[in-house]
């Protein structure tokens, strides 16, 4: 899809897996949340993130579309070529891989689909600043982007007892412990370390 509006229209044509509120299944809901932010704020999702999260936290190297001045520091995306057994720069790959446009994970130089669920590129230092702000309850160096109660709420498990991260079967090790990995508002939450192979602490979110 060329942008979030077109993406949401395509998603809306798909049949429901089940009635909303009756079950939990990991989904693309957070992708659609980006469109909700656009509609409420009157800004594009990338503009909203820049003005309300990245700039206040001093995250100068986090973008959907990498500016030309920063591209020499940006590593290209690679895919594994089974024929040669080697990684290949996706920009040098034959069609149809190199012809896909406006896909944030591939075409970082020309992006129009600002997804709520993925596509940002960043640096370890920028991400550390964001993580530290979350660890501090929504603030960094005296600048607040979220209230402490909001951080607590979004990082608390909101699934009913017995529900877990269903839908992650394609990721090794997760399906077996999905009943003890809860989900907040955009974060997976550890609810019981005695029944999981995931190393962590109760209440940990990621």
Which residue ranges define each predicted feature?
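Short, intrinsically disordered, charge-balanced linker/junction segments flanking boundaries
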Residues: 1-2, 200-206
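Short, surface-exposed loop or secondary-structure junction motifs
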Residues: 1-196
